[in-house]
């Protein structure tokens, strides 16, 4: 990638595929950013560039690279292999990590809790923010993983018919609204909605508050 191409990416600012860090944050935060980009559609992580696109540079390539590799290999499951390059730009050195659009989603962050309990949480990008993926989004990513693909059997019952009628009238629905509409549990609602997304009948939309679903 040429210097002009890199400068163009930086000039366009943060997005669903680009994250800037003036310096590497603590490892858990770094893992969340990497998880979010890999679980969305891949992209770039720049160290030494601030949110306002100003290039500050880094003090130690080795230290910053080690932080990224540690976050990736010890705080993510499954782990990711990133391409990490030091780049001299405007007389300053920055680090660029290329994060793949992974096939093996969701990449979950391992979060240590008291009593030796480890939580696993997936993250996604919504605009320039990294947010925790909803359980239905994480479930959908799991089904799309080539290691977990199963034959899809769809049956349209009364609850799906009520869902379609609701969407034709109101255009969108959340899991909570679907539970209330059909008097089913959250788990059952998620399974039903994810199956319909996989079948291409409805689509999921990521929102910083709640994911919602619409007809295709």
Give names to the regions the model predicted.
Residues 1-216:
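Conserved N-terminal catalytic/coupling substructures associated with nucleotide/phosphate chemistry
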């Amino acid at each position: 990638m040429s210097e002009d191409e890199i400068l163009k990416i930086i000039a366009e600012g943060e997005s669903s595929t680009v994250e800037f860090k003036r310096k590497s944050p603590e490892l858990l935060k770094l893992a969340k950013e990497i998880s979010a980009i890999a679980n969305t559609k891949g992209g770039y992580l720049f160290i030494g560039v601030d949110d306002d696109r100003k290039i500050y540079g880094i003090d130690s390539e080795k230290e910053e690279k080690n932080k990224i590799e540690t976050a990736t290999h010890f705080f993510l499951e499954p782990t990711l292999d990133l391409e990490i390059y030091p780049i001299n730009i405007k007389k300053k050195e920055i680090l660029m990590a290329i994060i793949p659009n992974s096939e093996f989603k969701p990449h979950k962050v391992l979060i240590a809790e008291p009593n030796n309990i480890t939580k696993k949480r997936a993250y996604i990008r919504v605009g320039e923010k990294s947010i925790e993926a909803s359980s239905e989004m994480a479930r959908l990513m799991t089904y799309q993983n080539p290691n977990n693909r199963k034959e899809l059997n769809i049956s349209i019952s009364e609850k799906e018919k009520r869902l379609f009628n609701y969407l034709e009238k109101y255009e969108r629905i959340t899991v909570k609204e679907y539970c209330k509409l059909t008097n089913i549990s959250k788990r059952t609602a998620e399974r039903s909605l994810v199956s319909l997304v996989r079948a291409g009948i409805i689509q999921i939309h990521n929102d910083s508050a709640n994911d919602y679903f619409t007809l295709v």
